[in-house]
Amino acid sequence: MQLNYDYFTKPECKILLPKVQTNPRYKNFTQLYYTVGDEEQFWVETTLKPFLEKDGDASPQSQQRVASQENVWRNLETFVPWQGYENISAAEVEPTFQYMFNRFKKGIYVSIAGGRLQSFVPFSKANFTNDWADRIQIDPKYGSFLNFLKAQHDLNNKWNGTTYKWNPNKVCPDPRYWYANNCIVRYENPISESHSNVAQIKSMLLELVEKRHISDVKFFINRRDFPLLTRDGTEAYDNIFGDETPVPEQYRHRKWLPILSMCTSERFADIAIPTHEDWSRVKSDEGIYFPPVCRNYTFQFVHTWSDKVAKAVFRGSNTGCGWNETNNVRLKLARLGTVRPDLLDAGITNWNLRVRVSKHSPYLQIPDPGTLTAVDRLSPHQQSQYKFIVHVEGHVSAFRLSLELGMKSCILLVQSLHGWKMWYSDLLKPWVHYVPVRPDLSDLFDRIEWCRANDAQCRAMAENAYQFYRTHLDKESILDHLQHTLNRLARQFTAQEPPTDPLLLQMEWERQALAQLAPQKTSALTGQFPPSPFRNWGSLCGFEKFVTQALDPRMEMGSVAVPGKTIFKSKTTKVTLYQLGGTWFVAKRTINLMKKLEFLHEGFIGKMVLNNLVKWCPNYLYTFHYRDEPFISYTWKDYNSLEGGSRVFNPTVKESTVMQEFIDGPTLQAFLQTCTFKSYFEVLFSLCCALLLGQSLCGFVHHDLKPWNVVVQVLPEPTVVEYTVRPDPNSGEKFLTWKIKTRYIPVMIDYGKSHVVYRNVHYGVADQFATNWSLDLQTLLVSTLNEWMLRYHQSEGKENPSPDYGDLVYTANFLSTRPLKTVRDLAGWTLANKKFQTQAPLDFKIFPSNAPVIEDFLKHMAPLTKKYKISFGKGAATAAGWSFNPRQIVDLAFSLDPDQQANAWVQVPRRIYRNPLPAATNKLVATFIAQQLWNGLVVPKLGFVDWAQSENLNRSVAESIWNEYDKMEKFLTQHYWSKIDKMTPAPLTIEPYPDAFQTLVQLRLKPTRSLFLSSDKLQRLRRNIAPQYDAPAFPDYDQYRGMILDMVKDSGPFKLTPDLAAFYLDNLKPLFDEKIMEAVTNLETIKFYTQPTTKSKF
């Protein structure tokens, strides 16, 4: 969302504009233009939206554009070539963005395509933390950063004559959250999210593409005045890092998307372009002014040379990296004005006392004006009354030079100590356009006296400067310069069609897979879905089939399902209860583009992967269906839209819906408001075990495991929950199984950002190709402990804090690098790290990617298990649990009368009669078949008894059906036992295996987004792994691991003996080797994304 005005045609534009939240995700984002605050929002604006709009009509062209041949800069070099900008592609967008976003907070991404401004995306990292806080020190005399900042505040009041009250809450005493502009640091709280310069830059680019022919090109614009990218790979901010510190390894790239800045030097690769002040100046002549400053640059410099005062003049602030007269050239210039006022009228008009960081000082410095006093301002018109104008830079070039060149005065240009240049600097010639002055001002008085003695020469230089101003600094020249620069850059892009973004590819494959699951025809809803006495996988699976068969994709969902209450509503999502066949389920709907993608992903991983986990673990949510709604049926009030409309919404977009089971219970956030310490730890242990199981079976990472993304089901009585997670050679049962007795079943919800491995291929959104085993635990602990700290502070003064809060401190010390000793320590630690984007790496222990972090955490928590008498620990796996037959449940649900319902029960044994029994030559496979058939028969058999009694079924009919079940049960038991008993255990061979594993591990390939975004990298990769394309694909090992888990937990007549279990676990050991499985997944993912014609694996 943005305001109606990008600029104003009246100087009254400085009338206070109401602050409107233009980014619905961040309250303090009140910029004029929608500014993205995180990586996800950037991806939506720069990749997803252009992808969805690529078939749209191009914007109409209003007039004939000027070709490059007519450009006044066509024979001039507007930038020095650099190999980092040669042979580049769209693959450089992401690494360049990461560099600017993570290290410098803000910038603008621009894409020009088809002669129009396709993308103009300002960005500012909302939860910014720097990587240089450890280099910041203060003089020990201050004692703390807060005291230092108060001293700065007091000095600012003193020197500027203000009386602002000191408010410690308005500054941030933690330097990790500061940001810098090389030597100048910002530390206000909250950090200012301004929109300065953005309106001018966008206006300039819009007029450029309207009036000039511009080739397709992509680039970034630096919103700061200090350049960002060095040519030699060292840190840009030399005053923080020094002169020779290389950038961190993750930001050392061979190729970059061009970064355009307002200032540069030979050290930097930034390309200088016309400044926002240049554009404001030329547009103010047209009566156009830009917020928020709305400065009027229209001046009439009418003073003749003979009427001008024969003195030099300077007015300005004390900006610059120095902090006193010895190292700040502007302060030194002001002092010289007091020494020879007959030659020089120089002074500081306001004191810029922002804290400075300098490579020449070990401590932060507060500028010290000494004995200087502020002087009156002089307008540009008043300054033009002087014959000589001293131009001196601040911490970079001073942008005012373009205006000063038009004042018809002689410029005394102080040479840049660091070689700073603006877009036209190389065209200015000493003694032609200006009089050069040494950087240290040592010859300033001599230059002024020379100017007085050589009036005619200075008048000629003033005239040359003015003519340069008219020919090279007007609007046409600005547009010419941009045209020439951008068209030169466009030629550096390779002609190859850039690869499709891997997340977009994944989105399309997920959509295809879900479409293939849709039934060929739907059935009319005829009755009630059979209620389940308790939550179980078989019943949920049956309701999934019931939902998909009952909901016609061509019809509005509300025409079949009955809507209930809305249980959640935000700016992007609406969650509503629906009832179908007497059973409640949840429908999450959205029209937000990113949420639609996340819902698609959630539907895919739910139906393909996570639904299976519910069979073994009650802590995952079952997904029934995903659909794109056929009609636009929502209204604005259906969402918490922002006043004035929001960029989140497009009224022509249809909603997307994901349907999931309804868990009746509070969120973990609400649960933590009143729960006991014991119940909290029970919930925590249950979630840890669920994560262990998900990681082992399918590489699950939730990526947003916060208290509001967990619903706690409260049971009437405690129950024992088992988590059999992996083989354990030290266990007598050969498998590691955790058990907990509890009334609280926490269920994870909202999988839109989650990662899984499906058929040996990575699928994810937040981190598409990586499994981070510690991330969910870290997020869960920090966020839940933060809720405890909020509860603690709310209770202060009302009751005596429980001594058990110390156990929370003990819990946090598993993650914290520094020992936390008190609740106060814990509160500070959680406050600083409660948001993932601001978590400081120095605050957290570093765990190897494949380390058993959660198991180590559970060991760490063992003393609290004993203290609170929690029934939790390792044990032997027992029954797999009661799981209904999904096919029988669906048949029962669509039955029209009691006869059809009875037939739904009897068809279970009859289907086994009618179909040939599966056979196997391997003892493990044969045992698995027998287990599955027996469980699929016995569970419905027991369920039939309850149903027959509730329906008062005729006794003879009931006995007849029971006998069919009984006969089939005996037949299956005898048939398979006779075969299994004669078999000798033989290794189960799963091709390709095991020799392929050794070669595989040696490849050490890892899929990354940057790998798939670069045509060159893809070509090299295809050559390197070419033999693998012809090799057989690895089988779906997740299915085999699930099969083994089913068998280990089975306690029926075909239960594995300990010897047989030990034999096959040793035989199938590679299936549970994390290094091997990681290598398999990485290779299969790379093959999947790099094959010339990628086929869907569904």
UniProtKB/Swiss-Prot annotation:
<protein>
    <recommendedName>
        <fullName>Uncharacterized protein 035R</fullName>
    </recommendedName>
</protein>
<dbReference type="InterPro" id="IPR051091">
    <property type="entry name" value="O-Glucosyltr/Glycosyltrsf_90"/>
</dbReference>
<dbReference type="Pfam" id="PF05686">
    <property type="entry name" value="Glyco_transf_90"/>
</dbReference>
<dbReference type="InterPro" id="IPR011009">
    <property type="entry name" value="Kinase-like_dom_sf"/>
</dbReference>
<dbReference type="InterPro" id="IPR006598">
    <property type="entry name" value="CAP10"/>
</dbReference>
